[in-house]
From Swiss-Prot:
GO molecular function: metalloendopeptidase activity; RNA endonuclease activity; zinc ion binding
GO cellular component, one term: cytoplasm
Cellular location(s): Cytoplasm
Primary localisation category: cytoplasm
Cofactor(s) of this protein: Zn(2+)
Protein's name according to its UniProt entry: Endoribonuclease YbeY
GO biological process, any: rRNA processing
Its job: Single strand-specific metallo-endoribonuclease involved in late-stage 70S ribosome quality control and in maturation of the 3' terminus of the 16S rRNA.
């Protein structure tokens, strides 16, 4: 089971009824089911903040020391590594988690204005762009990153595969 908590700090998000707990749960489940190590954990929790430029700018400054608004920020609750998920049956890090019935994945903050503007510029629906960013962020929460070309290719290929499940074309 996946429990999703959503805080909408910006009224424009309320216009997008399709961005809701059911969608977020469905996307999260689709990502997690790709990794056998998560199958033993019975309950996951994910916190979502739907906010605006001012708040995302503050968060980006505070946590990344970057004075610029961004589309999404991910804050993992656990120090996981994609290699542990992909290349081992049960890594020592994951072994600790598997003994528990519950795992808080982390927090994700989405910025309405940046996502809306990117959607317009890239000629895609804001919902499809949101789904892509959600997939990207969940992958960050479970240890994926794009610090080099190899990591970026692995992460992008996973995103493309998951997006195709939702009928969304590759953004790359």
């Amino acid at each position: 089971m996946i429990n999703v908590e959503i805080i909408r700090n910006y009224d424009k998000w309320r216009e997008h009824k399709q961005i809701n707990k059911a969608l977020i749960k469905k996307v999260t489940q689709n990502v997690l089911l790709r990794f056998d190590n998560f199958s033993k954990i019975k309950q996951f929790e994910l916190s979502i903040l739907l906010t605006n430029t001012a708040e995302i700018l503050t968060l980006n400054k505070q946590f990344r020391n970057i004075d610029k608004a961004t589309n999404v920020l991910s804050f993992p609750s656990n120090k996981l590594n994609w290699q542990d998920l992909c290349f081992s049956n049960v890594s020592p890090k994951l072994e600790l988690l598997i003994g528990y019935d519950y795992m808080h994945l982390g927090d994700i903050a989405f910025c309405y204005e940046v996502i809306y503007n990117e959607s317009y510029e890239q000629q895609k629906t804001s919902e499809n762009h949101f789904i892509h960013l959600l997939i990207h962020s969940i992958l960050h929460l479970i240890g994926f990153d794009h610090q080099n070309d190899t990591e970026a290719n692995i992460m992008e290929n996973l995103e493309i595969e998951i997006l195709s499940y939702f009928g969304i074309a590759s953004p790359y």
